[in-house]
Amino acid sequence: MNTSTAISFVAALVLCCLALSANALQIEPRSSWGAVSARSPSRISGAVDYVIIHHSDNPNGCSTSEQCKRMIKNIQSDHKGRRNFSDIGYNFIVAGDGKVYEGRGFGLQGSHSPNYNRKSIGIVFIGNFERSAPSAQMLQNAKDLIELAKQRGYLKDNYTLFGHRQTKATSCPGDALYNEIKTWPHWRQN
């Protein structure tokens, strides 16, 4: 086997593994955490340009499905009540129980980053990530979710990744998580 063929083979193998990884991602539906129906969901047509990463700023995060579902339900209650959003603000929630939960989901406008809501997918990590980064599993789940969004046509191949602090004056998604996402291939300085 010549060098060119070997490189092509390795590249194909890597792409195959990435595709399998994203296809293996299980997204827990809204019904799994007892979501209340959205008041007036707004559809987004076509692929969006941005992924915005957040943290929920819960000091202890969650590690069991019961804890995570309760926290997600509380976030939705806060967003619909105190903040008067039509639904939970995020499109997806990455939780410490090793799962990804559907917030608003794909193809719906979030309420997580003013000026970017109509052109982004908002992903929140449950926990406070000022001093320590999320687990390797949480980080991989977010990467797999982003890959899945691209594969399904909800996210452009040349998307830009931002931390919430790049779209609004806030410390979100925490220094440790922000420093982590700055190493991801689509992160850009704005």
From Swiss-Prot:
Induction of its expression: Strongly up-regulated by PGN from B.subtilis. Weakly or not expressed in normal conditions. Regulated by the imd/Relish pathway.
Major subcellular site: secreted
Metal-binding found in the keyword field: yes
SMART domains: Ami_2, PGRP
Glycosylation sites: 2, 84, 158
Domain of life according to the entry: Eukaryota
Domain N-acetylmuramoyl-L-alanine amidase: 47-174
Span of the signal peptide: 1-24
GO biological process: innate immune response; peptidoglycan catabolic process
Site (Important for catalytic activity): 90
GO MF annotations in UniProt: N-acetylmuramoyl-L-alanine amidase activity; peptidoglycan binding; zinc ion binding
Enzyme Commission numbers on file: 3.5.1.28
Cofactor or coenzyme needed: Zn(2+)
Record carries keyword Translocase: no
Effect of substituting residue 113 to A: In strain: DI7, Loua, Monty5, Tahiti and ZW141
Function: N-acetylmuramyl-L-alanine amidase involved in innate immunity by degrading bacterial peptidoglycans (PGN), preferentially DAP-type PGNs. Probably plays a scavenger role by digesting biologically active PGN into biologically inactive fragments.
Protein's UniProt name: Peptidoglycan-recognition protein SB1
